[in-house]
């Protein structure tokens, strides 16, 4: 399959200024109110059903965020200094010059954490996310991380919210920690398949501008079948991957700027992507995937 960026695809208009502020405000809810108020809880669930994405402000505590950041910084420091003796006993290390596992399913089903460094594709295709470190099952790296991550994810509450929103019981399938370090080669707008699937993203670091590499989303695209079929026909004709949203002309996308501790929750059937970063930018996000 070819990359959607190698031929003429149609991208959405990325909102900015007051238009972006208004669009994001309509899907934003204080986490404390969603917890305490049934009215706010229902409003958040309904917004997720309608728009495919919401932002819960202030979902994680500063203490949990600081502890996660400190432990991950120490872990990366050990890898960069080639001090791997302890890590190799508790995790699979997929380093740029030494790969021990291949394939998403093997990462997801691994019996221990997988620290996967994404690298440029050998065939030159775009969308590699080179420069990203994707840690599968980070909660298993230590008991402290396990507790802190569980505290940040609020899985029981999110499962109840997803039940009200989608009328389906969703289960946790995989937890990840995304560490983006100057990622320039991001995948264009796409969906994660056509089955019902949600992800929560807890921002461990602030994402204040496009250079930070925010999560971008076309509101309502999870329900707009016309957009999907238009892209599907184009993809088949041009040998693109089946899940690329290649024909998004006439649509608008939002970039989710957020503070550390905010949680974004989105339907992965919708058109989404990560914005390319500045070469020196850093972004850390805790991710949870929910499926039936």
Regions found by a protein language model. Give the residues of each.
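Histidine-centered catalytic micro-motifs
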Residues: 186-193, 271-274
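A short hydrophobic beta-strand segment most commonly corresponding to one strand
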Residues: 200, 280-292
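Double-stranded beta-helix
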Residues: 208-271
């Amino acid at each position: 399959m070819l990359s959607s960026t190698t031929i003429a695809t149609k991208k959405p208009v990325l909102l900015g200024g007051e238009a972006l502020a208004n669009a994001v405000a309509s899907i934003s809810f204080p986490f404390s109110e969603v917890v305490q108020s049934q009215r706010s809880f229902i409003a958040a669930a309904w917004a997720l059903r309608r728009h495919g994405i919401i932002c819960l402000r202030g979902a994680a505590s500063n203490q949990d965020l600081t502890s996660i950041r400190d432990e991950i910084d120490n872990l990366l420091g050990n890898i960069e200094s080639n001090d791997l003796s302890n890590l190799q006993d508790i995790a699979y290390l997929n380093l740029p010059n030494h790969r021990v596992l291949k394939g998403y399913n093997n990462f997801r089903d691994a019996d221990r954490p997988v620290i996967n460094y994404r690298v440029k594709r050998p065939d030159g295709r775009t969308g590699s996310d080179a420069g990203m470190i994707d840690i599968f099952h980070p909660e298993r790296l230590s008991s402290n991380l396990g507790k802190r991550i569980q505290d940040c994810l609020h899985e029981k509450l999110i499962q109840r919210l997803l039940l009200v929103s989608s009328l389906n019981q969703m289960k946790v399938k995989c937890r990840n920690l995304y560490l983006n370090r100057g990622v320039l080669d991001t995948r264009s707008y796409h969906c994660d398949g056509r089955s019902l699937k949600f992800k929560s993203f807890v921002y461990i670091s602030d994402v204040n501008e496009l250079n930070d590499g925010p999560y971008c989303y076309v509101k309502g695209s999870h329900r707009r079948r016309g957009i999907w079929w238009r892209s599907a026909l184009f993809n088949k004709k041009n040998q693109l991957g089946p899940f690329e949203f290649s024909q998004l002309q006439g649509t608008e996308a939002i970039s989710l700027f957020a503070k550390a501790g905010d949680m974004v929750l989105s339907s992965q059937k919708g058109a989404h992507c990560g914005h390319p970063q500045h070469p020196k930018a850093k972004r850390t996000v805790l991710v949870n995937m929910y499926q039936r």
